[in-house]
């Protein structure tokens, strides 16, 4: 009995202590929250812009599974200049959007929680050393759509956790050596649309110090005439759209999974273009202004390719029967290819040696091709997928889907054209000869005429005039 009572007392005491600690903790949280709130207000609703559209939107979200607090601040489209911003960011800030303002330099902001900073669409023309060094937790930095042309060495110092760096649509040209070296875990780098980047002359990896383990690199519209990247760098995605490349660069990382080489100056796709792309699963050869031919074996080495697109390469008019390798292998080999697009090209026909390959596809896009629907192409009707290919010739089925046009309309002239010519010519010759013969046949024969003229029955025959015996009776 006594022991039960003491147990009850102990448990009561325990509950009390527990309650007390909870209460204290709560008070502490409330106090901290009050401090944050004041600080947040100072940043989000500054005195100078109270009750105007220039105040930022601040929202609390609970990020991460542990329910840590995180503050997202959206100050986009506010016409802010650098001097308008408070440099110390509120506690718990996670992301700050300063896009579409009028910042002409990057303010040296300070926060040890900020993960994402968006400065796109401002008027920043240069970065100075240590520009981001007080943002020690930064993971993503978006600096696209400015006019950054000058970067001091050390511009990216103090960003050991940065994973994504966007420098697209700027004016990068001469860059200090080892510029990117402080970015130890950088995974994605976008330098697209820096039209003078070809002048930088430095090798990205050894010269500019890009993280060896970079996985995504974008170099669209950088006026590149050639490119060498280390073969053994573990790069996964590379975009080289809209450059001045005449061949697919021979030396690219072996690990590439996705390559976009669209809108470059290739005229033909050759076997050496794809020879080293042994791991590529997605290959984009779109919008090529000059590409006319895909030569035999041009795509024979890309065994693991899943997606291939020639979309909108408007000069492309020849796809070799053996573009995907010798006929023998295409008919037996199981390829990984699932999606193939020739949309908007000038291809008229496909050799039936491609049938086994096309039959495996889950997607084949033939929209807008001027297809020549003759007996060579009738196999296309048998494909299990809808290609949206339409006949352009012959004229009587123009515009009809290959699948809905009648099979017997896909006919070929069994004789070659010159044979028709020959037949017509010989017909003309024959009838000429016939007419000649008829004319000759109808014309009176000279011998016959003479005989008739002087023959016995002819009125012109010789007559003998006998004397009139009645008038001279002797
Ligand atoms: C952008 O900066 C340049 C100088 O770098 C200046 O001449 C120009 O007026 C600025 N534009 C805006 C919209 O502030
Ligand atoms: C960069 O590209 C421009 C435009 O194509 C060209 O005029 C210039 O010579 C190139 N510079 C280098 C160093 O390749
Ligand atoms: C493939 O890569 C190797 C190693 O970089 C290179 O020597 C070779 O020329 C490349 N082959 C072709 C056909 O480009
Ligand atoms: C299709 O390709 C094979 C093998 O290259 C070739 O012999 C044949 O003539 C081609 N057919 C047509 C209609 O071009």
Indicate where each model-derived feature is located.
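Extracellular leucine-rich repeat
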Residues: 2-474
């Amino acid at each position: 009995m006594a022991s039960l009572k003491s147990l009850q007392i102990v448990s009561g005491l325990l509950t009390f202590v527990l309650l007390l600690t909870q209460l204290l903790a709560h008070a502490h949280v409330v106090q901290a929250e009050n401090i944050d709130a004041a600080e947040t207000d100072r940043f989000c609703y500054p005195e100078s812009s109270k009750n105007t559209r220039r105040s930022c939107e601040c929202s609390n979200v609970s990020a991460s599974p542990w329910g840590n607090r995180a503050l997202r601040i959206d100050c986009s489209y506010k016409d802010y200049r650098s001097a308008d911003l408070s440099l110390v960011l509120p506690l718990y800030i996670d992301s700050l959007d300063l896009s579409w303002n009028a910042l002409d330099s990057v303010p040296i902001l300070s926060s040890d929680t900020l993960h994402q900073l968006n400065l796109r669409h401002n008027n920043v023309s240069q970065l100075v050393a240590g520009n981001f060094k007080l943002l020690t937790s930064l993971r993503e930095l978006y600096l696209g759509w400015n006019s950054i042309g000058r970067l001091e060495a050390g511009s990216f110092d103090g960003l050991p956790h940065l994973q994504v760096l966007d420098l697209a649509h700027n004016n990068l040209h001469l860059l200090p050596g080892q510029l990117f070296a402080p970015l130890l875990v950088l995974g994605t780098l976008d330098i697209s649309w820096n039209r003078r980047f070809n002048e930088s002359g430095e090798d990205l990896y050894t010269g500019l110090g890009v993280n060896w383990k970079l996985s995504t690199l974008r170099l669209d519209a950088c006026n590149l005439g050639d490119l060498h990247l280390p073969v053994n760098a573990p790069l996964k995605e590379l975009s080289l759209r809209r450059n001045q490349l005449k061949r697919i660069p021979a030396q690219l990382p072996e690990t590439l999974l996705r390559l976009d080489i669209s809108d470059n100056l290739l005229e033909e796709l050759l076997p050496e273009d794809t020879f080293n792309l042994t791991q590529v699963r997605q290959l984009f050869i779109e919008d090529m202004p000059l590409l006319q031919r895909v030569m035999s074996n041009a795509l024979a080495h890309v065994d693991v390719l899943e997606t291939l697109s020639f979309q909108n390469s408007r000069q492309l008019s020849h796809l070799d029967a053996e573009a995907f390798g010798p006929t023998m292998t295409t008919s037996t080999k199981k390829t990984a290819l699932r999606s193939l697009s020739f949309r908007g090209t000038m291809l008229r026909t496909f050799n039936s040696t491609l049938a086994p390959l096309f039959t495996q596809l889950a997607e084949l896009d033939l929209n807008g091709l001027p297809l020549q629907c003759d007996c060579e192409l009738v196999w296309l009707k048998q494909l299990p997928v809808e290609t949206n290919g339409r006949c352009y010739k012959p004229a009587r089925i123009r515009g009809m889907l290959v699948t809905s046009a009648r099979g017997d309309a896909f006919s070929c002239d069994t004789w070659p054209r010159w044979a028709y010519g020959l037949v017509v010519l010989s017909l003309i010759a024959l009838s000429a000869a016939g007419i000649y013969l008829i004319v000759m046949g109808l014309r009176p024969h000279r011998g016959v005429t003479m005989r008739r003229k002087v023959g016995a029955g002819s009125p012109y025959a010789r007559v003998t005039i006998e004397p009139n015996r009645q008038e001279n009776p002797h």
